[in-house]
């Protein structure tokens, strides 16, 4: 992804026109759950390729490719999209059957949506946001690695990391600290105040 700032600006400009979005914290949460589903769909495609018996924890109607992915102008939008997201997608993902034996890569869906919210009230604008995110090609090596920077870029672009409950440490600082620590293969590292994972990324 060559222009993360431009990508975030497009999303921000669309969401600014939605009456349901009130402040940067809500913008971040709205973008986050949509990005999660887009990335998860890409990962599931990999898992299905690796294991022909793989079964998604997400019911078919709620999988990204079946409700969010662009379909030559035939995708859901407007009130129909809002009704689906609010009354089908969220209730379904919040109440996925998860127990101690559920693999983490499946349980993470329910965990992610347990406290998530759809703040957008305009289904047409929501469709525009979804289409913008759907344009990401996360199967591309460079773009999938750039995804790790998207959340940090959101915080910087919205200019309110602190008030949104997240504090961003510049990449130059995390890289410098990793060089000073000089991590070695076999060592363990923990960031007990992990936010966007910048220190962990630099460690790797």
What are the language-model segments listed below?
Residues 196-204:
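Conserved SAM-binding loop of SAM-dependent methyltransferases across substrates and taxa
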């Amino acid at each position: 992804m060559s222009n993360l700032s431009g990508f975030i600006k497009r999303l921000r400009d669309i969401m600014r026109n939605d009456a349901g979005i009130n402040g940067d914290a809500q913008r971040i949460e709205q973008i986050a759950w949509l990005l999660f589903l887009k990335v998860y769909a890409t990962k599931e495609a990999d898992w299905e390729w690796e294991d022909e018996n793989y079964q998604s924890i997400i019911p078919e109607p709620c999988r990204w490719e079946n409700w969010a992915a662009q379909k030559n102008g035939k995708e859901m939008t407007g009130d129909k999209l809002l009704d689906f997201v609010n009354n089908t997608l969220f209730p379904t993902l919040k109440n996925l059957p998860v127990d101690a034996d559920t693999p983490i890569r499946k349980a993470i869906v329910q965990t992610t949506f347990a406290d998530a919210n759809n703040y957008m009230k305009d289904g047409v604008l929501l469709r525009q946001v979804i289409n913008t995110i759907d344009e990401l090609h996360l199967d591309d090596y460079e773009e999938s690695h750039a995804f790790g920077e998207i959340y940090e870029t959101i915080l910087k672009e919205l200019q309110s990391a602190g008030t949104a409950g997240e504090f961003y440490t510049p990449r130059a600082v995390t890289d410098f600290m990793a060089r000073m620590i000089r991590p070695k293969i076999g060592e363990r590292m923990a960031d007990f105040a992990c936010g966007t994972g910048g220190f962990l990324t630099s460690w790797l």
